[in-house]
């Protein structure tokens, strides 16, 4: 059965969307329709900011202890609904169910409980020499979040902002939004004051840009692509807003000559393939001694076989499908680019895993003999693709690691 959500959470209540336009959410494991959500408008984004601005004075004047109590109740409700949330995120994102419960739900639950504690313990005012430092909430925060760890990224932003005394307008990713609706249901259930938390779904160029541009938005916290982050910063600069950006990555994993190679390679590959490589801090560049390259390659091929994806709900693999058809094609294009530029494909490739032709699956893929000037060594792929780059000296290894736009 398709999940249908047709309202936004604004000023403490569910408000029916004005536009009939909707956005489809697909099941990553099958490609089938999973849910539909409303496509928000500029007017609805503005209404959410106005509600947050109206609620700010009262909320910022509540005691940190009281704010912490709200956060703790939210944490408890998330824990109560952990099975439901894990299933939702496994369907939306494709992370296997067991990992989804521990990571995609466990970490958000912890984020709210930890910020509840911090709110009560935080030093809001202190004397330093002849000066008094007073820490005050920033104001209305626009939180714009990605799809790869959807509820966790939401929770990190929302919990911290609420603990600080800020009010929030959330725009979750339209690719994986149902978990955000459940969080809004929980926030409504615990009785958070009206306007303190608001949520509008929709497209970034419409809802996201409206939130960033609104004169009553005081701060923007954005996690997503570098391209979108540049756009957020440019719009926010027009009104000199505070901006926090967490963008892309192409992290290097240097393995030294005297390392325990089997252990280091296996650990590095898990940190590359976690969440099917859809992690901004994934260790996607393995920089290894040239003298041990052949050994590393053999271990990488054998280890990759243990990461062959399976259905995120019923399977037992450590990885599942990619989030969408768009992401699947993007990863395939990068694999083809690696082949075209002369990297040596030692396992994986663009062919779907056997028996997983439906859904958005890609084989775990390893390239060796990769040079730093190759596209796959420079650009964020966001899929289960590892580049092995050999080095001759430790100085060269460091230079390789630093040869990145990130």
Placement of each model-derived feature along the sequence:
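Conserved glycine-rich beta-strand-loop-beta hairpin in the small C-terminal domain of fold type I
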Residues: 359-362, 379-385, 404-406
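Short acidic active-site motifs
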Residues: 44, 206-207, 396
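Residue-level signal for inorganic ion chemistry
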Residues: 31, 67, 89, 112, ...
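ALDH superfamily catalytic-core signature
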Residues: 219, 227-371, 393-395, 399-400
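Short, structured beta/alpha segment
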Residues: 1-91, 262, 339, 391
